[in-house]
């Protein structure tokens, strides 16, 4: 005689394997992230200040009038590339402040860690493109000021405006450091996401 016992639904539910809980994200990832973003803020702010204070006045000869020299000022806002440099790094500086505060919030509430890592990876790449483009544009103008261009008859100016060129060169070097920091932040976000996915499998 066939059994009329029906399987217990609760027993069936208990036998179904439950999906693994989401892997917890180690907080030291975001501790390093905060440190790098603070350093990004410091480098971008320093580059902005150094470039904005690039200013020098020297006596320059007047073409066609021998012996006559007039004061000529060199400032960063005389070049669109340098203006773009300051604007781009100002955006990156503001971005570093916002993301630093966001990372501190994630350390306090790690439940949103994965979403923030994904958004960080996207926005950091965008910010790296902005900073790198600004550094390249300003670097091209600075190189002409340092070496000149005989083919287009653009004369060099750094032999006259030495302090101005030192400010520009220092700002470019600091912005390169900011670009490296952004690369490290992108690598950190991607590696953190990859590690989290591997632990969740």
From Swiss-Prot:
Gene source species: Ricinus communis (Castor bean)
Cellular compartments per GO CC: plasma membrane
Cell location: Cell membrane
Alphabetically ordered keywords of this record: Cell membrane, Membrane, Transmembrane, Transmembrane helix
Location, primary (coarse class): membrane
Topology feature Extracellular, residues: 51-80, 146-167
Keyword Membrane among UniProt keywords: yes
Cited NCBIfam families: A_tha_TIGR01569
Cytoplasmic side: 1-29, 102-124, 189-201
Biased composition (Basic and acidic residues): 1-13
Disulfide bonds: none
Identification of the protein by name: CASP-like protein 1D1
Record flagged with keyword Coiled coil: no
InterPro entries linked: CASP/CASPL (IPR006459), CASP_dom (IPR006702), CASPL (IPR044173)
Entry membrane topology: Multi-pass membrane protein
Subunit-level organization: Homodimer and heterodimers.
Residue span of region Disordered: 1-22
Top-level taxon of the source organism: Eukaryota
Family the entry assigns: Belongs to the Casparian strip membrane proteins (CASP) family.
Membrane-crossing segments per the record: 30-50, 81-101, 125-145, 168-188
């Amino acid at each position: 005689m066939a059994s009329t016992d029906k399987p217990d639904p609760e027993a069936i539910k208990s036998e179904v394997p439950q999906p693994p809980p989401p892997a917890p994200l180690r907080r030291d990832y975001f501790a390093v992230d905060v440190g790098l973003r603070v350093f990004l803020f410091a480098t971008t702010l320093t580059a902005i200040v150094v470039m904005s204070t690039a200013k020098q006045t020297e006596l320059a000869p007047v073409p066609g009038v021998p012996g006559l020299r007039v004061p000529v000022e060199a400032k960063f806002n005389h070049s669109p590339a340098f203006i773009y440099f300051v604007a781009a790094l100002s955006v990156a500086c503001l971005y570093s402040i916002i993301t630093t505060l966001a990372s501190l919030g994630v350390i306090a509430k790690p439940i949103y860690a994965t979403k923030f890592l994904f958004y960080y990876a996207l926005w950091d790449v965008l910010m790296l493109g902005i900073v790198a483009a600004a550094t390249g544009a300003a670097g091209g103008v600075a190189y002409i000021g340092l070496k000149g261009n005989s083919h287009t008859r653009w004369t060099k100016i750094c032999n006259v405006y030495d302090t101005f060129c030192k400010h520009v060169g220092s700002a470019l070097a600091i912005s390169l450091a900011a670009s490296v920091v952004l690369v490290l932040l992108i690598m950190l976000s991607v590696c953190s996401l990859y590690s989290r996915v591997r632990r969740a499998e």
